[in-house]
């Protein structure tokens, strides 16, 4: 149990630090959107950046919840506190995923219009993950896939925590 708890503490710390870094980058992108060349897309993209920032902040909180649950397990406490921690994390992740999916559905509906799709494909944004400029359209697609995979992985971590504590 000690090895599992220590592994979970390290995992939670890595999740917390990486997600906090991504939240900071998304927050900075929110500030730079006034410099975009397509004025019609600014409000839409600023809202997406804000939701993106909140999304990574939620995952940073989930990292802290993993640490809290692991410390609770390490102290040989009963399984009930870990179950409550996991339940609150699942609730956070569910709300976050729903908001993220609604936002991306709006992007899809707007992005289907040919005039905007052409501009989105030609509009270049700096992407820290690729360390160069990529099309806004490509970036939105990749972010949606990666973030949903991250939601599923974090939900599975809390499922494992719940099983261990019972």
Regions found by a protein language model. Give the residues of each.
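Membrane-interface helix-loop junction between the first two transmembrane segments
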Residues: 20-43
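Alpha-helical transmembrane segments and immediately adjacent membrane-interfacial amphipathic helices
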Residues: 2-24, 51-112, 135, 140-166
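Short, Lys/Arg-enriched, Gly/Pro-containing loop segments at transmembrane-helix junctions
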Residues: 31-32, 108-117
């Amino acid at each position: 149990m000690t090895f599992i708890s220590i592994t979970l503490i390290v995992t939670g710390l890595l999740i917390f630090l990486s997600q906090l870094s991504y939240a900071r980058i998304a927050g900075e992108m929110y500030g730079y959107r006034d410099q975009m060349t397509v004025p019609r897309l600014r409000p839409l993209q600023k809202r997406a950046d804000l939701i993106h920032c909140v999304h990574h902040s939620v995952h940073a909180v989930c990292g802290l919840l993993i640490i809290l649950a692991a410390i609770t397990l390490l102290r040989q406490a009963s399984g009930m506190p870990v179950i409550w921690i996991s339940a609150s994390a699942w609730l956070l992740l569910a709300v976050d995923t729903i908001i993220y999916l609604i936002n991306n559905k709006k992007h899809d509906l707007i992005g289907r219009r040919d005039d905007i799709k052409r501009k989105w494909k030609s509009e270049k944004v700096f992407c820290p993950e690729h360390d160069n400029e990529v099309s806004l359209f490509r970036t939105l697609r990749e972010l949606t896939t990666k973030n949903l995979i991250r939601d599923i992985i974090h939900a599975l971590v809390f499922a494992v925590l719940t099983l261990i504590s019972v």
